[in-house]
Structures are given as C-alpha cells and as structure tokens.
From Swiss-Prot:
It is found in: Cytoplasm. PANTHER family: ADENINE PHOSPHORIBOSYLTRANSFERASE. Disulfide bonds: none annotated. Keywords: Cytoplasm, Glycosyltransferase, Purine salvage, Transferase. GO terms for biological process: adenine salvage; AMP salvage; purine ribonucleoside salvage. This is Adenine phosphoribosyltransferase. Pathway: Purine metabolism; AMP biosynthesis via salvage pathway; AMP from adenine: step 1/1.
Amino acid sequence: MIKLTQEEQKYLLDSIRIIPDFPKKGIIFRDITTLLNNKEALNFLLKHLKERYKDYNLDFIAGTESRGFIFASMICAKLNLPFVPIRKPGKLPFETFSCEYDLEYGSDKVELHKDAFKNIQNARVLLVDDLIATGGTAIASYELIQKAGAKCVEACFLINLKDLNGANKLEKLTSVYSVLEI
C-alpha cells in the first residue's frame, strides 16, 4: 500500500486552512478550499491517489455530496473511470436506493441511483469523501453501494478526524485509507 511520508503529509496539511469556531463555537474547521486553490499541493495529492489506486482494478468511483464530488471526480479523470454521485435526498432524478443515518441531533439520508453501477454485478467501487468524522455518511454510503449490487473495495478520505472514531467504525465493513490523520 502506498502511503505518504510524514513530510509529505505535513506539506498537504499546511495547505489546508484552519478556522476555529466554525460553523459553531468549539469546532475547528478544516478548509480544503486552500488546498484546491494550491495547484502544486493539489497535483501532488492527485498524483499520490492515482499511484495508490491505479492497480485496484476499479470499475467506478463514488463520491459523497458535496466535497466528495470534487476529489472523486478528479481521481476519476486521472484513472479514466466513471463517477457515481451519492447525494442528499431528492437530488437524483431517477429511481434511488436510500439509507438513513443518525446525526448528533436527528437523522439524515443519502441516495444513489438504482442503476448507478450499470447492473455490473459486484462492480469494484472506491468510495471518496473529503473527511470522515463520526462515520455516519460514509457507512450509509457504503451500505448504498452494497445495496446496488456493487462492492466497496476501499473508502478514501483526505482527512480522518481520529478522535471521532468514524474510520474505526467503517473499517469493520471495508478497507479505509486516509491521506491525513488529525
């Protein structure tokens, strides 16, 4: 497995702006727009991810709304693979599978087109998002991929917020790779 050195991780981490108390007091927000706006850091990240996934024999890359779309579609372009969106309820125009997950206060859902994987049985899918925190969205997305008859071979995140334990929960279901552990 290809992983970054500590020096390479620091380089990427330094390209992400930290905003304290956003969106509410006590939260430390990791603003990836500064990474997206840094062509050297972005190209370094994409080169790394292309190298990591080029031999996974993937059929599709699925990205979760909305920042997962950014990274998933760029990886798709690098690997010449189709992109599959996993969206919030009511955003996809055709028949969907949906999966509900718990939030701190309440619940939410994600949806996936029923024909997203073109009826390729056991299609090999990489799930991509910018960040994993508690794991609710990622686990629901994993379940949608399985429900659609595909196999999530790995979930990839730019950032893993380790203290919130989401990656540990998801690792019980599939392999997890996080570029940066915070």
